[in-house]
Amino acid sequence: MSTLPVSSASFSSSSLLPVNDKSSKKQDVARNTTTFDASIWGDQFLTYDEKEDFVVEKQLVEELKVEVRKELMIKDYEPTQYGKLIKVVDAIQRLGIAYHFEMEIEEALQHIYTTYGNNWINSKNLESSSLWFRLLRQQGFNVSSEIFKNHMDKQGKFKETLCNDVKGLLALYEAAYMRVEGEHILDEAIEFTKTHLAIVAKDLSCDSLSRTEIQQALKQPLRKRLARLEAVHYIPLYQQQPTHNEVLLKLAKLDFNILQSMHKKELSQIYKWWKDLDLQKNLPYVRDRLVEGYFWILAIYFEPEHSRTRIFLIKTCMWLVVLDDTFDNYGTYEELEIFTQAVQRWSISCLDTLPEYMKLIYKQQVNDHQEMEEALEKEGKAYQIYYAKEMAKKYVRSLLVEAKWLKEGYMPTLEEYMSNAVVTVGQALMIARSYVGRDEMVTEDTFKWVATDPPIVKASCLIFRLMDDITSHEEEQKRNHIPSCVECYIKETGASEEEACEFFSKQVEDAWKVINQESLRPTHVPFPLLMPPINFARICDVLYIDNDGYTHAGAHMINHIKSLLVHPMV
């Protein structure tokens, strides 16, 4: 149903209630269950070394930040040096330290946009114009892709002579992923650069640094990368560049390790909460995937100021895991109906109406929300929990729809399936909750905006749902599960499985175009509030880049987690 952390699993079509459920004494109830492996992490993250206070390092970071701010002072650059300035901005962003300099970066790029509009000073240089285009589009400035006509022939094709400009090709490739619907010049740019970069990547005469960057880009363009993982990837590459800025490099390494320590401490705190619930004993059918869940949340917010929101999000994430496994993997339809009704009422008085094993789920759900509501009430923000609850109610209702389809053996139309499945993926719910407990930028209008299913939220949800279904539909059909979008499409059109997956992969790319369009100014909400739906879409490209990274947490997923939460940057 929804897309939530899993690891490898074994399937059993009819199991019995766990022995700790009192109702099992009355009768044996056949259940459609999946047995999941234990967490591969054990108690590795349960304790945190309090000695890691980084007092000296934090002071050094503050000193280095002063030096970097000088590098970003737009007034200190002649117009002919703006090409150098945008390279500094690009390095800062890719090194993962841009959150320290948001105001300075905005001021610099705003000045460049105001001064030049669509006419970049160095438009004849493919690398420079591509970098200019990408950085301004990322910042929400709607610069025109017509600038790339400078590099096309009379037939409207990119000049073959560009093949000799490897840096320019790579920069154009990355820029083209900022495309919106109807930008055929950027569609053409992706096809052109992909073809030629693939050749370069196999050319042993090309330097290893360039080959590494190209291979990474072809696997995952910058637009779809997560900031923290990009920092892990880029810091060593940047260090190898002969012209690297030593101040930026030193700051990036120090900052990475300070953040990693903070995240480990946070994970240790949430780990204690998770262990106290003792779900392995009380709800043994539930996946134990706290670390994977926290990795997911770090993809949305990694900055220190979002700690409270992160903790609320990880609790939400794990609550969704429990709900997903209960609806997908354990509860009878009658029990799920009762639970759904209780969620709609959202009152602790509903406990007595629930089956014994559901009481822990419901009580914890109510308590976690009440705890956050009480904290927010002191700040005049209790309304945020109202909206969080309403979206949770919608989510649970949609889970029940799928449970009903499964019970009745109903094959939904593709339209029916998708309208419900973009809710059960849980993405919109998580996006809304990413605003809970944030700074004053968030207002009640922010939650009203999310509740209308705006295009950027719809697109983010669609990406998650489609990428999940494409990678996991075969395995899900081996057990008792509702059809995915792939099966629905095949039934309606007579297409092959390969054709169905190609169709939905194209829809994923189209959804990214919507995200890019909705990120251009003027935006419906402040620009920083668009980052959660963008980052939730990006996490899909990490989870599903090779296969279902949650269902089968392979080496790449384990390495990602270790790189962020175990291994320091040296």
Predicted regions and their residues:
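Terpene synthase/cyclase
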Residues: 1-570
